[in-house]
Amino acid sequence: MPQITVVNQSGEESSVEASEGRTLMEVIRDSGFDELLALCGGCCSCATCHVHIDPAFMDKLPEMSEDENDLLDSSDHRNEYSRLSCQIPVTGALEGIKVTIAQED
C-alpha cells in the first residue's frame, strides 16, 4: 500500500496508507479529512475534491480530462498543480506523494 501525505487546509500534514484501486478522493475522505467535501461522490461533477499535487508526481498521473479541466476553471484556487482527487487512481507510482487539500471557494 502506498504511503501518501495529506496536507489539510490549515497546513497540518498526516501520513496515510492508500489502497491501490481506490481514488485519492476516497482515501482522503475515508481517512477523516472532512474538509474534502466530495459532494458528488467521485462523479467528476462538482470540484469539491480539489487538491494540489506534489509537482514531482504530476507526470505519474493520468491526463486531465476536458470535464475535469472545465470544473477546475471554476476555482479561485486553481494552479498548475490542481487536480480533482476523484480522477486520480491510487497506484504504486504514487508512493510518497504529497497532496494538499485546496482551500474552499
Curated annotation (Swiss-Prot):
Provide the binding site for [2Fe-2S] cluster: C40, C46, C49, C86
Tell me how this protein assembles: Monomer. The dicamba O-demethylase multicomponent enzyme system is composed of an oxygenase component (DdmC) and an electron transfer component formed by a ferredoxin reductase (DdmA1) and a ferredoxin (DdmB). In vitro, dicamba O-demethylase assays in which DdmA2 is substituted for DdmA1 demonstrate that the two enzymes possess nearly identical activities.
Give the molecular function GO annotations. 2 iron, 2 sulfur cluster binding; electron transfer activity; metal ion binding
Q: Which domain of life is it from?
A: Bacteria
Q: Which Gene3D superfamilies match?
A: 3.10.20.30
The record lists the organism as: Stenotrophomonas maltophilia
Q: What does this protein do?
A: Component of the dicamba O-demethylase multicomponent enzyme system involved in the degradation of the herbicide dicamba. In vitro, functions as an intermediate electron transfer protein.
Keywords on this record?
2Fe-2S, Electron transport, Iron, Iron-sulfur, Metal-binding, Transport
Instruction: Return the protein name.
Output: Dicamba O-demethylase, ferredoxin component
